[in-house]
Amino acid sequence: MSDYLDYLEKLAAAAGMTEINSFASLKEALKNRMAFFASMGCNVSDHALEYVMYYPASDDELEEIFLKRLNKMVLTKEEELKFKTAFMLFVGKEYHKLDWAMQLHYGCKRDNNTLMFEKLGPDTGYDCINNYAPSAQMADFLNALIVTDELPRTVIYSPVSYTHLRAHETRSNL
């Protein structure tokens, strides 16, 4: 749990903020960093997810969830999914504003080799394909961005689920 709190401190410093103490301030820090990366020529994002989730929540709920995590309390699975959904919707909308492409790699089973994880840390090449892919949630996530006309150019990678993706192709992203 402290890894995330440590990350928030580093993000705040990189964004020129004294602290990140709310979901709203997290979004401001992320906007700041995206603007920096855009100024350096970045135009693509890359997210590796177990699956693309969709559990919408109100702003008040999200602030409560964020504060719970800041206070080192354990989130329920539902709270975690609501937070991740809100996070991904937020960055997706920001990518749209910046005209970035959003890459979603889903179906990832992370850090499968305990020995190498302990030696090298997370995300160092010991991942594999997972077959858990709730396509209805991914469809709802994409639709939430489509209905507000904020879906960025999107590339979705999942070798086990390509047939689920065809319904979201449009002329603008072919």
Where are these regions (language model features)?
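N-terminal low-complexity segments that are often proline-rich with Ser/Thr-Pro
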Residues: 173-174
